[in-house]
Curated annotation (Swiss-Prot):
InterPro entries: BRCT_dom, BRCT_dom_sf, PES. It comes from Aspergillus terreus (strain NIH 2624 / FGSC A1156). Residues 571-676 form a coiled coil. This is Pescadillo homolog. PANTHER family: PESCADILLO - RELATED, PESCADILLO HOMOLOG.
């Protein structure tokens, strides 16, 4: 006879473990368990049947995989957590005895320090894996870099996040890896391509942040601790891959003066030093009798110099640089018009890096300096100036500098009388320029021009982005308009369906005619309302008493009712009178035109145009009806499954086309009102 299977030894009860059981098994506190799970990348799981997975009667429990908890038993951080707990007990005991010096000594010398290097290597075996997981890390670190320091967020954490973020930005500037950016309500989105991996992160706007108590900063601080270690590894690898020293030199004084990116100085690993060491070994080998070794060393020296490009003159290097810049990306065009359109490659890093290279920009005080400086430098601009109030590191602080070609302004254009006076300049300071003045030979643009240019990959017309102009729509570069969807960048003629403009024109004419007809009716209704009010006043004056003339009025109304014989005769008479009146007025206009010697243009032309429009609309409606009938016949030949799928597709396409038609009609009305 087979043994009775014991409950809870197989299936979901064995595969899952509750959080309380996991904490007891690891013998650590709940906050340490949360930190350990965040560091190791272990998250709660949801079993298919909680009753089978749980051994208790409490339904609201958090489950983990048993294998994950078993994996945590061998983690070296567990010993660190236990050591921290032991040191905390000793510190509490010393404070209880009043031995403050011993407590500070224990905290300073004996507190164990956590290192997450081995966890980074475990979770990301290759560098590509680390790059793929860099989106959330950058978003969180840029968020903490813009937060104010509080009791939950210490200043050291903010300074560390700022330093790592600026180092990463310097790598993007050096390699021209930034591709796209988008201004949204949440913040500024950036996308960079590093070693074939697209990385996107969000940077908040620099507003005054109010820290709420709803956020659990202990959990976020754990993520920040892990992500700072990750970004430090990534920055070291990225800097080493392009031959730069890490970490770069950091000037504390210029950073305190608001230099930000300019506070860092990048240094390359000098190849000449390696060449000198090899040359020194070459001399020693010449003194010896072994000439083969000297040849090998000389070959190594030649190889290093050749790879570094030290054997070429400056002219050759400039010629090669110009040749590389002139190389364009191949475009793949379809051979036949019916063939599929091939996806075209994006702009290369060299073309993107030279977009703003020949220009000198000046950022006004009202424009956001930090994102503009980063984007302009990432796309090749080497000369960026701003006011001295905005910090150090500018190419020039003089707004009247003649070398400036573009000035980024975010103020509305004011009339000459409304401009403020020229501020008084201090001794030895840069002469101030009156706000709102235009310097000849300089292009004034709004900040959106920079973002739209990098998203389009080319320089756009600056007159569309001049101060005071209505800006074009700023669209997301990652959302491409699909077929049938509304595209605000295209004209109405390119998006309208066949006969849509004619139908819209007819509807507007009908609405205008109805408004014209409603106008006299409203006047008549107002007149009737006034008459009824006057009658009510008369009745109120009578006081409800019968007047002698009331019987006569009733008899007259009775006679009128008896004489009334229907509407047919009256309507026919009125129609004939209207026709006679219209013919008479038309004949009178013809006589007046003949007397004046002018050609007479009657309403016949407009009637013909209306008839043509109505005939076109009827043709389009008949064509659509025919297409719908043909589609219905084709649907009858389909199976039920395919027919249902087709109906779902048609329903979604119909909804999309209706939304696009609404947006087009709204745009059509706005354009007409703008023309008026």
């Amino acid at each position: 006879m087979a043994k009775i299977k014991k409950k809870g030894t197989s299936g979901q009860a064995k595969n899952y473990i509750t959080r309380t059981q996991a904490v007891r098994k690891l013998q650590i506190s709940l906050p340490d368990f949360r930190r350990l799970c965040i560091f190791k990348g272990i998250y709660p799981r949801e079993p298919r049947n909680k009753k089978k997975a749980s051994k208790t009667s409490t339904p609201n429990t958090t489950f983990y995989y048993t294998k994950d908890i078993q994996y945590l038993l061998h983690e070296p951080l567990l010993r660190k957590f236990r050591d921290q707990k032991a040191v905390a007990k000793k510190i509490a005991r010393s404070l209880g005895r009043g031995e403050v010096g011993d407590a500070s000594r224990l905290e300073k010398n004996h507190a164990p320090k956590l290192t997450l290097d081995h966890i980074i290597k475990e979770r990301y075996p290759t560098f590509i894996d680390a790059l793929r997981d860099l989106d959330d890390a950058l978003s969180l670190l840029f968020l903490f870099a813009n937060l104010p320091s509080t009791s939950h967020v210490p200043p050291k954490t903010i300074a560390l996040c700022q330093r790592l973020c600026h180092e990463f930005q310097h790598y993007l500037i050096t390699t021209n890896s930034l591709r796209k950016s988008f201004l949204s309500i949440k913040g500024i989105y950036y996308q960079a391509t590093i070693q074939g991996q697209d990385i996107m992160w969000l940077v908040p706007y620099r507003f005054v942040q109010r820290v709420n108590g709803d956020v659990d900063y202990r959990i976020m601080a754990t993520f920040v601790e892990f992500y700072t270690t990750l970004l430090g590894f990534v920055n070291f690898r990225l800097y080493s891959s392009i031959g730069l020293r890490y970490p770069p030199k950091f000037d504390t004084r210029s950073d305190e003066n608001g230099a930000e990116l300019a506070a860092f100085t990048l240094e390359g690993r000098a190849v000449a030093n390696a060449a000198k060491t090899i040359e020194g070994s070459n001399k020693q080998s010449n003194n010896s009798s072994n000439q083969e070794v000297s040849r090998d060393v000389q070959a190594k020296v030649d190889k290093v110099i050749k790879t570094a490009g030290l054997d070429k003159t400056k002219d050759e290097q400039t010629v090669e640089a110009t040749d590389e810049n002139t190389d364009a990306i191949d475009r793949f065009e379809p051979a036949a018009p019916e063939a599929d359109t091939l996806p075209q490659p994006d702009i290369s890093g060299e073309e993107a890096g030279a977009l703003f290279a020949p220009f000198t920009f000046y950022i006004s005080r009202e424009a956001p300096k930090a994102p503009l400086e980063f984007i302009l430098r990432a796309f090749g601009c080497k000369r960026i100036g701003w006011d001295a109030v905005m910090g150090d590191g500018a190419f020039t602080h003089n707004e009247a500098d003649t070398r400036i070609t573009h000035q980024i302004v975010d103020r509305p254009s004011l009339p000459e009388g409304a401009l403020p006076a020229v501020p008084a300049a201090k001794e030895g300071a840069v002469p101030a320029v009156r706000p709102g003045t235009r310097i000849p030979g300089r292009t004034y643009i709004q900040p959106q021009w920079v973002w739209d240019c990098i998203n389009e990959g080319k320089l756009l017309r600056p007159d569309l982005y001049a101060p005071g102009e209505t800006l074009p729509p700023h669209l997301s570069p990652w959302v491409k308009p699909s077929k049938g969807a509304y595209d605000p960048r295209a004209t109405l003629a390119e998006q309208e369906e066949e006969g849509e403009a004619e139908m819209a024109g007819e509807e507007e004419e009908e609405e205008s005619d109805e408004e014209m007809e409603e106008a006299p009716e409203t006047k008549k209704a107002d007149a009737k309302a006034d008459e009824s009010e006057s009658e009510d006043e008369d009745e109120s004056v009578d006081g409800g008493m019968d007047v002698a003339d009331s019987d006569d009025d009733e008899s007259e109304s009775g006679q009128e009712e008896e004489d009334f014989g229907g509407f047919d005769d009256n309507e026919a008479a009125s129609e004939s009178e209207d026709e006679e009146e219209a013919a008479r007025t038309q004949h009178q206009k013809e006589l007046e035109a003949e007397a004046a010697g002018l050609p007479f243009s009657s309403n016949g032309a407009t009637d013909d145009a209306k008839k043509k429009k109505s005939s076109q609309a009827k043709k389009i409606a008949a064509k659509k009806r025919k297409e719908e009938e043909e589609l219905e016949r084709q649907k009858m030949m389909m199976s039920r499954k395919k027919r249902k799928l087709l109906e779902k597709m048609m329903y979604s396409n119909k909804k999309q086309s209706e939304e696009a038609a609404k947006l087009r009609s709204k745009r059509r009305k706005l354009e007409k009102t703008g023309e008026k």
